[in-house]
Amino acid sequence: MQKKRVVIIGSGPAGFAAALYTARAQLKPVLIAGNALGGQVSQTHEIENYLGFESLSGMELVQKFQSHVEHFGAQVVYDAVTEVDFTKGSPFTVKTHGETYLADTVIVTIGADPRKLKVPGEAEYIGRGVSYCGTCDGFFFRGKDVVVVGGGDSALEESLFLTRFANSVNIIHRRDTLRAGVQLQSRAKKNEKISFTWNTVVEEILGGDDGSVRAVRLKNVQTGEVYEKPTDGVFIFIGHVPNSQIFAGQLATNDNGYIITDQRYRTNVDGVFAAGEIQDEIWRQVITSAGQGAAAGMSAIHWLEEHEDELQPLEEAVQET
Ligand code: NAP
């Protein structure tokens, strides 16, 4: 059992930014990294839109985040949270595979994952033609032909963004009606680079001899016809899945499972904060998540200042339990 002033759950940009701010406030935060250090960022081939860096890989950025926070006294733990108890108020219990933490404040930055198609070839070609982020990877498809899977706002917004680079963007949707808002629909339908393939699902993503995507195998769900469509890239926008299941029944979420926070990144539990993609279903950028994490870190610092008189010394609290 360890008692901490601040426990941060998640090692994406929001988590590291929260760690930086709370570490520089001398709070010695512990950041529980989860199963994949850096989350979605570490899987990003190249990042060109994080301020101050013209180009670096996601993994490089995560390593910089880690050495920065450790320099100021944050502790990064390679472990995953298995259970939390926020029901009795602060201090909260956070259990990992290897440790139990008693935390005066908790900052939840556990992120969301792009929903996967779960078809053969998808996992294999991530970063080699398969992408879940047009803003991150569109630039690498200049003059290329790409397909986009999905029919919601993200699919259309990202398709429009991709037309800045790609020669053509074909939107593959499983129905013949788009879920996206009418304005986006109208902009997409007017764009000469965008075409639609209706009532169609991707059955497989196929690679070429060079190890990158060369085609998709499609199935028309109405006629049953199966055929190959050559493409240089497959952008998948079929929604995100926030990793909020572990907090079910404790932290309030919206209908899509995103944790609800106020402008100070406070959740419904006093002393528990959330930042980044676990509570933001709109922006999903490294830079915006980092900003939100910094703000959540500052909110936790303020919370600890306001409750200074009630906080138990760290050693005493552990002996009592
Ligand atoms: P979404 O609205 O849930 O749309 C997901 C799309 O993917 C739907 O068209 C869905 O098809 C399709 N889909 C889901 N699972 C699939 C599967 N296994 N195979 C093939 N297709 C599948 O997700 P989103 O577009 O990411 O949007 C999420 C939220 O963010 C929404 O509330 C949206 O309004 C908001 N958002 C807003 C903006 C904006 O306002 N500018 C931009 C982006 C996102 P069906 O239609 O058949 O269900």
Task: Go through each PLM region and give its residues.
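Short amphipathic alpha-helical segments
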Residues: 19-20, 43, 118-121, 159-161, ...
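A Rossmann-like FAD-binding core segment of flavoenzymes
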Residues: 69-95, 100-101, 164-262, 302-321
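Predominantly flavin-linked oxidoreductase catalytic cores and closely associated redox partners
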Residues: 99-196, 205-211
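FAD-binding core/adjacent interface of flavoenzyme oxidoreductases
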Residues: 1-9, 25, 30, 76-144, ...
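FAD-site-proximal beta/loop scaffold in flavoenzymes
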Residues: 118, 124-140, 236-288, 292, ...
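Beta1-alpha1 glycine-rich phosphate/pyrophosphate-binding loop at the start
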Residues: 4-74, 144, 156-182, 254, ...
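Glycine/Thr-rich phosphate-binding loops of Rossmann-like dinucleotide-binding domains
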Residues: 40, 116-117, 156-157, 179, ...
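Residue-level detector of alpha-helix initiation sites
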Residues: 12-13, 36, 112-114, 153-154, ...
